[in-house]
Curated annotation (Swiss-Prot):
The organism of origin for this protein: Geobacter metallireducens (strain ATCC 53774 / DSM 7210 / GS-15)
Catalysis performed (reactions): tRNA(Leu) + L-leucine + ATP = L-leucyl-tRNA(Leu) + AMP + diphosphate
Gene from which this protein is expressed: leuS
GO CC annotations on file: cytosol
InterPro entries xref list: aa-tRNA-synth_I_CS, aa-tRNA-synth_Ia, Leu-tRNA-ligase, Leu_tRNA-synth_edit, M/V/L/I-tRNA-synth_anticd-bd, Methionyl/Leucyl_tRNA_Synth, Rossmann-like_a/b/a_fold, tRNAsynth_Ia_anticodon-bd
PANTHER family per record: LEUCINE--TRNA LIGASE, MITOCHONDRIAL (PTHR43740:SF2), LEUCYL-TRNA SYNTHETASE (PTHR43740)
PROSITE patterns: AA_TRNA_LIGASE_I
Enzyme class: ligase
Protein name: Leucine--tRNA ligase
Origin: domain of life: Bacteria
Coiled coil: none
Alphabetical keyword list: Aminoacyl-tRNA synthetase, ATP-binding, Cytoplasm, Ligase, Nucleotide-binding, Protein biosynthesis
Molecular function as annotated in GO: aminoacyl-tRNA deacylase activity; ATP binding; leucine-tRNA ligase activity
Subcellular location field: Cytoplasm
Amino acid sequence: MEEKYIPRNVEEKWQKIWEENKTYKVTEDPSKPKYYLLEMFPYPSGRIHMGHVRNYSIGDVVGRFKRLRGFNVLHPMGWDAFGMPAENAAIQHKSHPAKWTYENIAYMRSQLKKMGLSYDWDRELATCDLDYYKWEQKVFLEMYEKGLAYKKTSYVNWCPKCETVLANEQVEDGACWRCDSEVTQKELEQWFFRITDYAEELLEYTEKLPGWPERVLTMQRNWIGKSYGCEIDFPVEGSLAKIKVFTTRQDTLYGATFMSLAPEHPMALELTTPDRRAEVEAFIDKVKKTDKIKRTAEDFEKEGVFTGSYCINPVTNRRMPVFLANFVLLDYGTGAVMAVPTHDQRDFEFARKYDLPLQVVIQPEGETLDPAAMATAYTEVGTMVNSGTFDGLRSDEAKEKIADYLAKEGIGTKTVNFRLRDWGISRQRYWGNPIPVIYCDICGVVPVPEKDLPVVLPMDVEFTGEGGSPLKKLDSFVNVPCPQCGQMARRETDTMDTFVQSSWYFLRYCCPDFAAGPIDKARAEYWMSVDQYIGGIEHAVLHLLYARFFTKALRDLGYVTVDEPFTNLLTQGMVIKDGAKMSKSKGNVVDPDALINRYGADTARLFSLFAAPPEKDLDWSDQGVDGSYRFLSRVWRLVCDLLPFVGKGGAVDSASLSDDARGLRRAVHKTIRKVTDDIDERFHFNTAIAAIMELVNAIYAFEPKNAPENGPVLTEAIESVVIMLSPFVPHVTEELWEALGHQGGVEAAGWPSFDPSAAVDEEFLIVVQVNGKLRGKVTVATDATEEQVKAAAFADEKVKPWIEGKQLRKAIYVPGKLLNIVVG
């Protein structure tokens, strides 16, 4: 082997071997335990960044470790390839989205291969491939048939320049994230998936995912937002109409003094009197320009407008003015809030601003609240007052009694409410999966017959940058005969939200070549669920919740048998440099290509895994990268130095080992135990690598290396180092393994076996205290008696001064740990 470690030579050699031999190609094998490992697939933006390097290196360690442990590992890679950036690039660079996307995929694939990642590339998929999205169209039609896909009118975030719907996350300070135009609220017909049908199950199963971070589960529970309360009808004064309210605080009903409606509420204009109409319409227009997240923020100024109408509190008969309020949303509860300013902080601020009445109905223990003197709302449990027959009860006890009373009187009903809303999937963009629906003036909404699938996304479109979908302007796509009556009809021009594609890709990886449907049930049965999923915390709610929903929906459609897609979830931290997340705008980006060209992929991997535990942020350090390279060079030199002495002398004979050889073997097996536990149980790759580094130091220090009797111990030690390092740095370890005389690759060797007898310490370090204070430490044999421990302690030079000339009262011995000498 070469004397000097030259990463490029080593890495190019082994990458070529892996590719030619399809080393990581995998098929179903019932004789082996399966392990499905997956990192969230990337958007093909053009180049990988250091976040990708870290994320995929984490996954690769797990995959390689599991293979060494005898698992049949599925570790695929693909591309989340539809989406708006490709259209933006088409407009800016006069390049078709398909060309831009596939060129990016080709480059990024080459980058990932240079990292030495153990993917089964035969399973690669891109969501913009017809072979992928055609099956998604079939699933859509089946969901439509089951009532899980439907169309309705709803208010959406709308960018007038891009002419498309924006998710809440794409609205930044009231502006479009892409073009910075002011976002408005627009009423639009959209396609939805009925995720709310699964709200209860999605919530229930958060208790059945022990391998998920509690933080993510909490975020999902909050997003689903189950709450118990009542729906209460408030009659509108002078009308037969009623305003329906959902509340979890029916104990405060007697304190409701006004009504707040969402500006989008269907009764908003109906309740507006002629003299108030101009002001109300101006207010509604203003609120439409504010995104929902900002409207519900605690620090956002609460504003409203009086409609001119009143409703009646059904238990007090109080006249309640009806306001529109900017902080009330139509898609939570009923879009109407009974305002109790004394016991809700937002209502309190609103009431003070518009000089509305306050009525205390819950008093703190031993205190009397004066509405005029209140500086904040009282929101804790207390004693009911001004609440009719419920006076004197604790407010938490009164909740159930008031709910029963409302039901008995026909005023309200007990209700369970969910914050979760159905998933709007319509996007007014070109580069996405066409929704397979046709609109006929005679037949109405007509699903595309399965025999006519797929609806192919046409390539001959023009990108003008004017906004809206180019599909709308393509007559050859839009104008089609109705499948039912044959009359000319119009094709749907909206495409599906890209979250749809990422909600089932992990299932298609099980059978990417399956030509008879979206999913081969038998193969999915073998591989699913994903044993380990790895990705960023930013996907905690949307992607992960949608993927859970889709899995359950596909289960109910008969495609899969699992209830959940991902058994275990790791959310890795960010890569930061100079105190901030790496980004082009901050000028603190490290280019992986440059790093790999200079140091090699193994060094890049080792640093990204050693610098911090996976779930923590990684602080970039040039010195750390250099240190990782030096360590690999050091291991290389060590193998070179040991080649004349290893592989000779047969198996280790424990009985004939010298003390030093026994000590080295003890270090080897302690390291095997620690590294195994750190990878398998904790994903503490940084401490696993640190333990291997310590073992390398111990091998360097071991002498004499050239003694024939030490050959077996040195062989076991250096081979264990190479195998344990191989999941982290696969190229250099394959080269070293070959240099050590092995054929068939590291994986064929299997993970080193831990020998408990070899790891047992022959000596203990005993802490010696005198009158409870640390005065020394002594080393004794593991089989030393209590008397031998005492003798060693009394003879210790550091302990002697504290006991000489003093009366020994007693000595308390904790075996193997501590001796406390009590003197007087």
